[in-house]
Design a protein with these regions (language model features):
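Short, functional "switch" segments adjacent to catalytic/cofactor/reactive centers
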Residues: 41-185, 193-247, 251-367, 481-498
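Active-site-proximal helix/loop microenvironment
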Residues: 519
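Sequence context surrounding c-type heme c attachment/ligation sites in exported
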Residues: 1-60, 64, 494, 498, ...
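Primarily short, surface-exposed interaction patches in extracytoplasmic proteins
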Residues: 1, 21, 222-481, 498, ...
Length: 604
């Protein structure tokens, strides 16, 4: 939302936004849309592949490997669900042991094959916490016993039993008849005994259901009519869409969390690696799109009360933000990411176009018409030129062949008299508008790391302008002329050089880069092997080698590096320094000096 809408919706995770009209429900409505997607094990095809013999051979091998992986996952998933429905007492006790802890995966470790599944423990824990109502027909008795401190269970359990099942007691309203029968014979000695009572009655219903399935050769949901009302109620505790055991099967990388035992993890990773390697390195493998896929069953979002994931509130259907004026922008169907993207990009949305053109303006002028590119809320500064912002936004979404064309916005800005101004100071203007908010001159902007590196490569004549291809490690390779756009970045451990030049942390969104002036930046340009190599390769250019004399060579260096001819004084200083040097050391130092000038590193 910050990137396209200029809104900090994340502030509404725990409570309604304190400044902007964004309720908590809007945050979780968007969360539900995004949570309904997963990262697939194998990215989808970028486009339909050509039907070649090479591709057909690839597809045959791919189908075999995908089927082996699919069969293995389905087998393990079925075993996991069966385990959750057969070891009910063990999972209930594990969830009981974590009842005062938030349901997070911090405790998840690799387990042995026969251990209970940590993911399923979490699901049982969340499920029980969702059914804490005093009138819950199945679990109300469980929660009355679970509220007794462990050390006092033997002393206080009889009183709890008496209040529900003894003479004069009042059972929880609408308590399931079968649960009542399993618990009413006498007070339990421990929570383990309560868990076993629940497990026993649930297994009885499960056994009855399996008899129906076997007798009808695969019963459909309508066959639940063969169970009585109390049996159907308990059947849903194991088979309902929100039941703890009804863990959805999603073929994404999240599968690893479902199977934490060592053997399954190793085998699953092995098979996944085989599919991935075949899809990337085999001849005939088509390009794939790095994107998410929609879940078959959309995620039903619920409000986290005060942002606490184990205190769930009301259900929230997927929808777009309701703060925008005019008719609400609805998400059609089940609220997919595609519908969300359309709601963001529609011309009915007054924010998107303004946020986009403001970001473009920021890149050209160093400061946006709105100075906070990612915050158009009530706390942001008003635009310096609101009419101009509206004009550019209208042009972006104007009807016609260039509707939505970013190139048209670039063209408008670049051909304007405002952009084509020099960055020369004027005393009267500076006194009236020292921050240049009225744009009486062009702002002088320092090159960021990527354009600075590309400019250094361009001076050598060896900048590689090819488009596409794999990333390259530009920080360790001895020499690589590829544009900095294709540089590899370790998201978890960014290189110190990048942070030195204010490249933001790639893990988090950054509205605008900071600009620092520190000693390591100058030392890099002075001493780093890359910049010395740039100077050497610049001097080795054929046109410089063919220059008739030092004066012509200096003039050509000025043209290559600074885009102009040297002034008479600059030329004389250069000739005085270089003298009649026949070796390249002075020339190397001179080229490095030009590369270190502000004129090279700044855009006027």
């Amino acid at each position: 939302t910050r990137g396209f809408l200029g809104l900090t919706v994340s502030c509404a995770r725990c409570h309604d936004h304190k400044y902007d009209p964004i309720p908590t429900a809007d945050y979780y409505a968007l969360y539900g849309v995004l949570r309904s997607s997963h990262e697939p094990l194998l990215p989808p095809l970028y486009e339909p592949p050509a039907d070649t013999e090479e591709y057909r051979a690839f597809a045959t091998g791919m189908a075999e490997r995908e089927k082996q992986l699919d069969d293995y996952i389905r087998e393990k998933h079925a075993a996991l669900v069966e385990d959750a429905r057969s070891r009910i007492a063990a999972y209930l006790m594990a969830a009981y042991g974590r009842r005062n802890q938030p349901p997070t995966d911090d405790f998840m470790l690799l387990t042995d094959t026969d251990d209970i599944n940590p993911t399923m423990v979490l699901r049982y824990q969340v499920y029980l916490e969702e059914h804490q109502q005093q009138d819950d027909p199945v679990w109300s008795a469980w929660h009355r016993y679970a509220a007794i401190p462990d050390q006092q269970f033997e002393q206080r359990a009889p009183a709890v039993w008496q209040s529900m099942f003894g003479p004069g007691g009042t059972p929880p309203a609408q308590l399931n008849r079968l649960v009542h029968a399993s618990l009413s014979s006498g007070p339990p000695d421990s929570m383990q005994q309560v868990a076993e009572a629940y497990a026993g009655v649930l297994k009885q219903v499960e056994s009855r259901w399996q008899e129906i399935v076997a007798g009808q050769q695969g019963a459909d949901p309508a066959s639940r009519d063969l169970l009585d009302e109390d049996q159907r109620e308990l059947h849903l505790e194991l088979h309902g869409p929100r039941a703890a055991a009804s863990v959805p099967l999603v073929f994404g990388w999240g599968l690893l969390a479902l199977f934490p035992d060592r053997g399954t993890q190793e085998e699953l990773k092995k098979r996944m690696k085989e599919v991935e390697t075949w899809s990337v390195k085999t001849a005939g493998a088509p390009p794939r799109a790095m994107t998410l896929e929609e879940n078959e069953v959309p995620f039903q979002a619920r409000v986290f009360l005060r942002g606490n994931p184990h205190r769930l509130g009301e259900d929230v259907p997927p929808r777009f933000l309701h703060l925008l004026p005019g008719e609400p922008i609805e998400l059609a169907g089940q609220g997919s990411r595609l519908q969300l993207a359309r709601a963001i990009a529609t011309a009915k949305n007054p924010l998107t176009a303004r946020v986009i053109v403001n970001r473009i303006w920021t890149q050209y002028f160093g400061k946006g018409l709105v100075t906070t590119p990612s915050d158009f809320g009530l706390r942001s500064d008003p635009p310096s030129h609101p009419d101009l912002l509206d004009f550019l936004a209208d042009r972006l979404f104007a009807e016609g062949p260039r509707r939505g064309s970013l190139k048209s916005i670039h063209r408008i800005i670049l051909t304007s008299a405002t952009y084509q101004q020099a960055s020369l100071d004027r005393l009267k203007c500076e006194q009236r508008d020292p921050e240049n908010r009225l744009l009486w001159k062009m702002n002088r902007l320092r090159l960021e790391y990527e354009p600075l590196r590309d400019s250094l490569l361009a001076v050598t004549g060896q900048l590689d302008l090819s488009i596409g291809g794999p990333p390259v490690n530009q920080l360790t390779d001895s020499w690589n002329g590829r544009r900095s756009l294709y540089g590899f970045i370790d998201r978890m451990d960014p290189a110190p050089l990048l942070t030195t030049f204010d490249v933001p942390n790639p893990v988090a969104s950054s509205a605008q880069r900071s600009e620092t002036t520190v000693t390591p930046q100058a030392l890099y340009l002075m001493n780093h092997p890359f910049t010395r190599e740039v100077a050497a390769r610049t001097l080795a250019r054929p046109e410089l080698q063919a220059a008739e004399g030092p004066a012509d060579r200096v003039a050509l260096l000025f043209q290559l590096i600074l885009g102009r001819l040297p002034a008479a004084g600059e030329l004389q200083l250069a000739l005085d320094y270089l003298g009649d040097a026949t070796n390249d050391s002075r020339w190397l130092h001179y080229v490095q000096m030009l590369l270190m000038t502000n004129e090279f590193a700044f855009r006027d």
